[in-house]
From Swiss-Prot:
Any one Gene Ontology cellular component term annotated for this protein: nucleus
Residues forming coiled coils: none
Organism of origin: Schizosaccharomyces pombe (strain 972 / ATCC 24843) (Fission yeast)
Reaction(s) catalysed by this chain's protein: geranylgeranyl diphosphate + L-cysteinyl-[protein] = S-geranylgeranyl-L-cysteinyl-[protein] + diphosphate
Pfam families: Prenyltrans (PF00432)
Gene name tied to this protein: ptb1
Protein name, as recorded: Geranylgeranyl transferase type-2 subunit beta
PANTHER family in UniProt: GERANYLGERANYL TRANSFERASE TYPE BETA SUBUNIT, GERANYLGERANYL TRANSFERASE TYPE-2 SUBUNIT BETA
Assigned EC number: 2.5.1.60
Gene Ontology process terms (BP): endoplasmic reticulum to Golgi vesicle-mediated transport; protein geranylgeranylation; protein localization to plasma membrane
Signal peptide extent: none
Disulfide bond sites: none
């Protein structure tokens, strides 16, 4: 079995935050808040939370807070539910939720919920299961789940439930690993997991493991290291992690590491990025790989954080 290149990954994480003299850094303004979450989670999972620059990160996140109560990806951009949940998750990790008006953020989120229970990503109206999950995740962290119309939210989530046991991004859409995570985790947070067939769901997820040990997002697709989180977390939520080959998946994930520069890629020998680094490490955490911080499969937050917040 390959080894986890811990020191390489720590150096990689420090390096990606200091590339301000590179054009690529500025071309990815739309990913800055997301990248902060992925980086902070990676530091936590590697048991190096003390190396997170808390003051710098909190200051930047506050510069992304808009008058509406939501967060933008970068100062001057529009707010969006995805940036809002990532910002709130980071503030929770850094024990800094007190710097925002929780009621105002919660009101912003509820303003995105539609009458049918779904949730818009922003004022422009795009609807997606990921957005509803993000709102539920965020409200739970803020202690404001009572703001949510839970009945309509659950009804809409169940409309995304498919005959094969999986979930799509909207009613009638094909089952997909990432949507399975968002819907299953949302139902778990809302204590409504009894509405689904866990045996059928476990079958659908276990079918995502392919030759070589990796997981894909849907049938006939290539494996990708990020599905070590998206597929595995709902399997953890329903208590069926033993339905996949643990050792083969670990070998696949470790095989996507860059032995020279650190970081994880989607597949072996591809370019690394902080997104795949975060979710590969989160997957290894669910697999109880040695010396990695335990993760909460509902929130993709360190278990220490969610336990402290009594989530």
């Amino acid at each position: 079995m390959a080894v986890l290149l811990r020191d390489k990954h720590i150096s990689y994480l420090h390096d990606i935050g200091n590339r301000t003299d590179e054009l690529d850094f500025w071309l990815k303004e739309h990913l800055h808040v997301s990248a902060i979450y992925w980086s902070c989670m990676s530091f936590w999972l590697l048991k190096k939370k003390d190396q997170i620059d808390k003051e710098r990160i909190v200051s930047f996140l506050l510069s992304c807070l808009t008058e509406s109560g939501g967060f933008a990806c970068y100062p001057g951009h529009d707010d969006h539910i995805t940036n809002t949940v990532y910002a709130v998750q980071v503030l929770a990790m850094l024990d800094s939720l007190h710097v925002v008006d929780k009621d105002k953020v919660a009101s912003y989120i509820i303003g995105l919920q539609n009458e049918d229970g779904s949730m818009k990503g922003d004022r422009w109206g795009e609807i997606d299961a990921r957005f509803l999950y993000s709102g539920i995740n965020c409200l739970a962290i803020l202690g404001k789940l009572d703001y949510l119309n839970k009945n309509t939210a659950v009804d809409w989530l169940m409309k995304c439930y498919n005959f094969d046991g999986g979930f799509g991004l909207c009613p009638g859409a094909e089952s997909h690993g990432a949507m399975v995570f968002t819907c299953v985790a949302a139902l778990k947070i809302l204590n409504k997991l009894d509405l689904i067939d866990e045996e059928l769901l476990g079958w659908w997820i276990s079918e995502r493991q392919v030759k070589g040990g990796g997981l894909n997002g849907r049938p006939e697709k290539l494996p990708d290291s990020c599905y070590g989180w998206w597929d595995l977390s709902p399997l953890a939520i329903i208590g069926k992690l033993d339905w996949i080959d643990r050792n083969q998946l670990i070998d696949f994930l470790l095989g996507t590491q860059d032995a020279d520069s650190g970081g994880f890629a989607d597949r072996k020998e591809d370019a690394t990025d902080v997104y795949h680094t975060c979710f590969s490490l989160a997957g290894l955490s669910l697999l109880q790989f040695p010396n990695i911080e335990p993760v909460d499969p509902r929130f993709c937050l360190p278990l220490e954080v969610t336990q402290k917040m009594k989530l």
